[in-house]
């Protein structure tokens, strides 16, 4: 009897789930129909405004009233997407004339729940609405949203700030994150800074000016941002790497920077790291082995060959990769292949086999193409 009750209960739960899914399908379809209906109505209105070549005060008031509702804003988003695909320049010009509308809406959406509050900055970022025009009310509101415990609200507010291109507001946003108890993934911050639309040189100077006051985590974010954005910081990055006691994570980022952007004065520092760390700090050694790719020369090849005998697999792997990137031939590695270290020989054979396979694939593609 108990087994039958459990089976009936299970069937009832399954039936309830199926019923719930069916209801959700109808609700979502009805919602999509409403959005499409609203969007078509907005398309007619916007096209008429574009034809008249004038955004009137009445049109701004109409949008200010309508777009306070999230469904209308979503429909307006669909409208702009469709029209932007047809004529980007016209829509950019149209959006530029709507700054008063979006300034007003910034304050309205600040009062709404987290999901709606996150959606509005997304629209600002998506259409670059305030780019180059950091209106104080807008920037203050976006900075307040960066305090939010919700990751979605914070990230969308940050993306909106980056898209506007205000150096001062971007620095303020970083300080909010720096002092916040809410975790924000460092990679997301780095990637966001790469989207900054303003004066990147001025931003870089401001970041260096305040660098020492930031937390270690934020300092690493800044160094990573420089690594992906500009070769103009080599001297400062080297100076950051040189002192004793520098945080390991920051040091790793500095080494990667100097590996991407070759800087001759950094070479003795990099080789010194390998000499000091190869027997007890494999992460330093592995990262530096990769960095030496951009420092070709006999000394570099000798160092990398020596690292092929390192007991750590990651060090050997990176050293072999760098040797191949330096353009070595099979004959250059005879001493390794004929040596007593089986692991060193194996990893280099793997590299050369991999190279042959890629060459064969490229040849096959070349022969098959017309």
Stretches with model-predicted labels:
Residues 1-40:
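N-terminal signal-anchor transmembrane alpha helix of single-pass membrane proteins
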Residues 26-114:
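N-terminal topogenic membrane-targeting module
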Residues 46-47, 77, 106-110, 142-143, ...:
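Amphipathic alpha-helical repeat scaffolds
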Residues 63-64, 96-109, 132-145, 167-178, ...:
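Amphipathic alpha-helical scaffolding segments comprising HEAT/armadillo-like alpha-solenoid repeats
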Residues 78, 86-96, 118-131, 155-164, ...:
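Structural detector for internal amphipathic alpha-helices that build alpha-solenoid repeat scaffolds
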């Amino acid at each position: 009897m108990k087994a039958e009750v459990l089976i009936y209960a299970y069937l009832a739960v399954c039936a309830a789930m199926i019923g719930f899914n069916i209801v959700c399908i109808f609700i979502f379809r009805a919602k999509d129909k409403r959005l499409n209906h609203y969007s078509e109505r907005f398309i007619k209105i916007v096209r008429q405004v574009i034809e008249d070549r004038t955004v009137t005060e009445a049109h701004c008031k109409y949008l200010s009233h309508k777009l306070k509702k999230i469904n209308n804003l979503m429909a307006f988003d669909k409208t702009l997407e469709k029209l932007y695909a047809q004529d980007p320049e016209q829509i950019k010009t149209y959006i530029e004339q709507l700054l008063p509308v979006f300034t007003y809406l910034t304050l309205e959406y600040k009062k709404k729940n987290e999901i709606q509050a996150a959606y509005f900055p997304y629209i600002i970022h998506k259409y670059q609405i305030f780019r180059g025009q950091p209106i104080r009310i807008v920037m203050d509101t976006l900075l307040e949203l960066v305090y939010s415990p919700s990751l979605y609200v914070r990230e969308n507010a940050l993306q909106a700030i980056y898209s506007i291109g205000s150096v001062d507001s971007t620095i303020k946003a970083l300080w909010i994150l720096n002092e916040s108890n809410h975790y924000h993934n460092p990679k997301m911050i780095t990637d966001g800074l790469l989207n900054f639309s303003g004066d990147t040189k001025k931003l870089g100077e401001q970041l260096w000016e305040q660098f020492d006051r930031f937390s270690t985590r934020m300092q690493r974010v800044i160094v990573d941002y420089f690594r992906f954005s500009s070769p103009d910081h080599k001297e400062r990055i080297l100076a950051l790497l040189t002192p004793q006691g520098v945080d390991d994570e920051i040091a790793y980022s500095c080494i990667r920077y100097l590996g991407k952007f070759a800087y001759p004065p950094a070479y003795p520092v990099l080789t010194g790291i390998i000499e000091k760390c190869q027997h007890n700090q494999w992460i330093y050694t592995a990262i530096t082995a990769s960095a030496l790719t951009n420092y070709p020369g006999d000394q570099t090849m000798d160092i990398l060959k020596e690292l092929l005998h390192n007991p750590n697999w990651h060090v050997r792997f990176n050293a072999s990769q760098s040797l191949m990137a330096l353009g070595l031939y099979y004959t250059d590695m005879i001493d390794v292949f004929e040596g007593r270290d089986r692991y060193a020989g194996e990893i280099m054979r793997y590299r050369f086999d991999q190279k042959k396979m890629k060459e064969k694939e490229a040849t096959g593609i070349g022969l098959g193409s017309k």
